[in-house]
Curated annotation (Swiss-Prot):
GO terms for cellular component: endoplasmic reticulum membrane. Its EC number is 1.14.14.99. This is Cytochrome P450 71D15. Hydroxylates (-)-(4S)-limonene to (-)-trans-isopiperitenol, a precursor of (-)-menthol, responsible for the cooling sensation of peppermint. Fluorinated substrate analogs are hydroxylated with the same regio- and stereochemistry. The lineage of its organism: Eukaryota, Viridiplantae, Streptophyta, Embryophyta, Tracheophyta.
């Protein structure tokens, strides 16, 4: 009898809560205007059922095929718009860019990025402009990217030594590439490799997997109950406390240390100095500095390592492309002992391989934006605070823009002059407009330089007798489009004299 009463009370609670949500939705003022078309929606959940069991970029690509390049999807309470064409993306990222320049906030970003005091997820504001300007001038300028060359060479040499010692055995390249990228970024930005390097990489991956804005509580932001019951929230706070401990140690170390690896200021020293400057427009808090550090790890490590791993995976699946890329690298660099950014500029085919990889596997498949004010895109009204998702993954596989879009074919870039610098809006893996990735050149150097070394110094085969056709090329869920499974490869040292 007591069990029956308990179930009855639970059912009454769920029904009452559902009715209250429906009433709130009915009472909510409806935006006015000509809105984008979209599929029929269900009460309460809208179009959430379309995402179940699928990666969001895949599900939303199907919506665009039926309803057009500017499509409306109702994700619970959140009015959302999917952009899947060059023209719509150009309007949102260039013509009405200021109106669409906010980021969509999620529970994950608010908790892990210190209430979005960072650069990636910060609203478009004076704080964002100030922090981005400091980041670009002190860390990510072309001059600085070149000055970090000896760090890249040192860390890549460390990786090559490890691979030579493991010759003939399967190596977890996912782990090795993530460690390499993280070490380069730590030394360039913070002056040294941190002790908790591996743990922080793991925390970054978990944070990004939970920051995509597809948690149930993100879809019903007005629901205090869902916000309270969000099971991921407690996990996020546990992660945040551990991240905070690691970042606090980095901050404390810089408070008592006057110089980094270069014998001068690193970016954290600059932020501390500017924190004391009474002339800056927006005060820099300690949380802002921590959020910036976490930004550097998450944006720098995850996107660069993701792209490098996808390149290696595609090369293993396409042996003819691998042979052509290795032949180019070995012919161009055989007389050089060390090389960096300027040297890889002559590797035209390898650079096309990287481009083709980012076309098929963009580091951020769905670029998140949010409206700061009502605007019009392709003739459709996008209301204030609407969530905008630019489906970079879908545009990269659209036959309107790409011949044989499902084929890995780097030679296509011999025939077209498309680049990813934010000018060709069907190909924006780094974004475009005001919020284009500020670390584009830094990230690209951290992909191309190690990749050239790996192709030059080793021949590669798949582990455990696998064939290219056996490879699992699935993507994991999350904000970044990482390989679902770790990439295991067997290196064999290359002898130039042979």
């Amino acid at each position: 009898m007591e069990l029956l009463q308990l179930w009855s009370a639970l059912i009454i609670l769920v029904v009452t809560y559902t009715i209250s949500l429906l009433i709130n939705q009915w009472r909510k003022p409806k935006p006015q205007g000509k809105f984008p078309p979209g599929p029929p929606k269900l009460p309460l959940i809208g179009h959430l059922h379309l995402l179940w069991g699928k990666l969001p970029q895949h599900a939303l690509a199907s919506v665009a095929k039926e309803y057009g390049p500017v499509a409306h999807v109702q994700l619970g309470e959140v009015f959302s718009v999917v952009l899947s064409s060059r023209e719509a993306t150009k309007e949102a990222m260039k013509l009405v860019d200021p109106a669409c320049a906010n980021r969509f906030e999620s529970i994950g970003t608010r908790i892990m990025w210190y209430d979005n005091e960072d650069i990636i997820f910060s609203p478009y504001s004076e704080h964002w402009r100030q922090m981005r300007k400091i980041c670009v001038s002190e860390l990510l300028s072309s001059r600085n990217v070149r000055s970090f060359g000896f760090i890249r060479q040192d860390e890549v040499s460390r990786l090559l030594r490890h691979l030579r010692s493991s010759a003939g055995a399967a190596v977890d390249m996912t782990e090795r590439i993530e460690t390499l990228t993280c070490s380069i970024i730590c030394r360039a930005a913070f002056g040294s490799v941190i002790r908790d390097n591996a743990e922080l990489v793991g925390l970054v991956k978990d944070a990004l997997s939970m920051a995509s804005g597809f948690e149930l509580a993100d879809m019903f932001p007005s629901s205090k109950l869902l916000n309270l019951l969000c099971w991921n929230k407690s996990k996020l706070w546990r992660m945040r406390r551990r991240v905070d401990t690691i970042l606090e140690a980095i901050v404390d170390e810089h408070k008592f240390k006057k110089s980094g690896e270069f014998g001068g200021e690193d970016i954290i020293d600059v932020l501390f100095r500017m924190q004391k400057d009474t002339q800056i427009k927006v005060p820099i808090t300690t949380n802002s500095i921590k959020a910036f550090i976490f930004d550097t790890f998450s944006a720098g490590t995850e996107t660069s390592s993701t792209t490098t791993l996808w390149v290696l995976a595609e090369l293993m699946r396409n042996p003819a492309v691998m042979a052509k890329a290795q032949a180019e690298v070995r012919a161009a660099l055989k007389e050089k002992t060390n090389w960096d950014v300027d040297d890889v500029q002559e590797l035209k085919y390898m650079k096309s391989v990287v481009k083709e990889t980012m076309r098929m596997h963009p580091p951020i498949p769905l670029i998140p934006r949010s409206c700061r004010e009502e605007c019009v895109v392709n003739g459709y009204t996008i209301p204030n605070k609407a969530r905008i998702m630019i489906n970079v993954w879908s545009m990269g596989r659209n036959p309107l823009y790409w011949e044989k879009p499902d084929t890995f074919w780097p030679e296509r870039f011999d025939q077209v002059s498309k680049d990813f610098m934010g000018n060709d809006f069907e190909f924006v893996p780094f974004g475009a407009g005001r919020r284009i990735c500020p670390g584009l050149n830094f990230g690209l150097a951290n992909v191309e330089v190690p990749l050239a070394q790996l192709l030059y110094h080793f021949d590669w085969k798949l582990a455990e007798g696998m064939k290219p056709s056996d490879m699992d090329m699935s993507e994991a869920e999350g904000l970044t489009g990482i390989l679902k499974n770790n990439l295991l490869l067997v290196p064999t040292p290359y002898d130039p004299s042979s």
